[in-house]
């Protein structure tokens, strides 16, 4: 049974959660990336398909996708423009609402794969201060800086298995 759902704003500009389930009896993987693109409650995009393929290969029954920023953009430059025009995100209601969804998904996930890519070097503040089971945090590969987790559409082998993050300032900057 394939289940698809998403939590998207009424204006359709922000996505807070994306879920794909193919086996409810198996565990779930959360992928945390930079920002959502076109996937929604019905349609998958390339990133979603890649995450599904990784999770199936690892024996999981579903994925959740959350993002550091909730703004839906196909290109990094569109996100940068939104960030520049938006101002202080840490006081923005969409950002705060998004972080509350991320917190919930992190706690529900059996495995968390950090995968936001090189457009956001280092680690976001909400992960540094969160009260999470840190053993859940993993990555596929790190970017050339040795700190930032690569995005699933990066130049990655399809045979990768998640590696555990050592969440501290020495690893994440």
What is the role of each PLM region?
Residues 38-40, 70-72, 119-123:
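Acidic, metal-coordinating catalytic cores used for nucleic-acid/nucleotide bond scission
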Residues 48-56:
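Short catalytic helix/loop segments, enriched in acidic residues and glycine
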Residues 79-173:
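Glycine/proline-rich loop-helix segments at beta-alpha junctions forming the active-site rim
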């Amino acid at each position: 049974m394939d289940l698809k759902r998403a939590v998207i704003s009424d204006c359709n500009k922000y996505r807070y959660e994306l879920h794909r389930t193919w086996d409810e009896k198996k565990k779930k993987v959360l992928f945390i990336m930079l920002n959502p693109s076109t996937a929604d409650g019905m349609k998958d995009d390339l990133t979603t398909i890649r995450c599904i393929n990784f999770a199936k290969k690892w024996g999981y029954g579903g994925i959740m996708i959350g993002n550091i920023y909730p703004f839906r953009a196909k290109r990094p430059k569109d996100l940068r423009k939104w960030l520049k025009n938006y101002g202080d995100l840490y006081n923005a209601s969409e950002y705060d609402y998004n972080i509350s969804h991320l917190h919930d998904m992190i706690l529900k996930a059996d495995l968390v794969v950090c995968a936001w890519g090189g457009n956001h070097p280092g680690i976001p503040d909400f992960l540094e201060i969160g009260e999470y089971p840190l053993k859940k945090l993993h990555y596929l590969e790190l970017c050339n800086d040795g700190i930032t987790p690569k995005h699933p559409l990066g130049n990655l082998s399809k045979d990768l298995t998640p590696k555990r993050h050592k969440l501290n300032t020495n690893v994440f900057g």
